[in-house]
């Protein structure tokens, strides 16, 4: 219920809001309530998984004349000034093609998600320190809160629906890197998020372990290998 109430606050912050429902059965009463509050709804019925939902939402927004698209999870809580501050950051990228995400504050570990940078033969994880500001270059950002420009979507194409669950966002970011599309974190904007469930065991200092279901882990490993 709280998620629905928050969703209904978004039309006051953004000119076009669409919710993509991946539930197997459409809730017509809920759809009518959202429509009355200014939220368009797409009943996707889990076609293509989360990637299919992303594609359906982005293509709906393209049809409405939008040139920047923001993606959120159902539990994302969007601050009042989020869109203005993120668009200000997007304007500083220096390229009409971009993927720009916020600084993600992981509630499960009470700290910011680090920057992930991948090169041909190496990878690096860099903490985001409290005093960081502006746009930070990286290779991978998570989908929640990310701004994608129309020019970037046209250059990169649709999200891969065969990935279905995990690494949909990572694959898209790696595709962006291969095509020279800038991937940035806007350190001036923070978005709280929960990433998996923290393990009760600490195997190594400051290594974050996410506990997930066995099925989710199988999908994750398969998609990571395919990446």
Model-found features: residue ranges?
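Active-site-adjacent helix/loop segment of glycosyltransferases
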Residues: 182-227
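A short, conserved alpha-helix in the catalytic core of glycosyltransferases
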Residues: 146, 152, 156-157, 162-189
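Short beta-strand-to-loop element that shapes/binds the nucleotide-sugar donor at the catalytic cleft/hinge
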Residues: 100-113
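A recurrent flexible, glycine/aromatic-enriched loop bordering the glycosyltransferase active site
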Residues: 128-148
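Glycine-rich, basic loop-to-helix element that forms the pyrophosphate-binding segment
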Residues: 45-61
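A conserved acidic beta->alpha catalytic loop
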Residues: 20-30, 46, 76-77
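Short, well-formed alpha-helical segments that are part of the catalytic scaffolds
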Residues: 1-11
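Short beta-strand-to-loop acidic/aromatic patch adjacent to the donor-nucleotide binding site
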Residues: 66-77
């Amino acid at each position: 219920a709280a998620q629905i109430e928050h969703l209904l606050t978004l039309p006051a912050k953004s000119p076009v809001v669409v919710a993509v429902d991946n539930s197997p059965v459409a809730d017509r009463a809920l759809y009518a309530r959202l429509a009355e509050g200014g939220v368009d709804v797409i009943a996707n019925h889990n076609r293509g998984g989360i990637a299919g939902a992303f594609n359906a939402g982005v293509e709906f927004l393209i049809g409405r004349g939008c040139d920047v698209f923001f993606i959120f999870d159902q539990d994302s809580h969007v601050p009042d000034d989020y869109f203005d501050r993120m668009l200000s950051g997007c304007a500083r990228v220096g390229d009409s093609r971009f993927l720009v995400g916020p600084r993600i504050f992981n509630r499960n570990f009470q700290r910011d998600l680090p920057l992930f940078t991948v090169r041909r033969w190496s990878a690096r994880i860099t903490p985001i320190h409290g005093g960081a500001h502006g746009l930070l270059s990286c290779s991978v950002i998570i989908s929640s809160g990310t701004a994608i420009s129309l020019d970037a979507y046209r250059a990169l194409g649709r999200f891969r629906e065969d990935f279905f669950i995990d690494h949909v966002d990572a694959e898209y970011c790696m595709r962006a890197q291969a095509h020279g599309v800038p991937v940035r974190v806007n350190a001036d904007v923070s978005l709280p998020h929960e990433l998996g469930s923290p393990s009760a065991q600490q195997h190594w200092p400051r290594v974050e372990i996410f506990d997930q279901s066995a099925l989710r882990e199988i999908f994750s490993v398969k998609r990571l290998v395919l990446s």
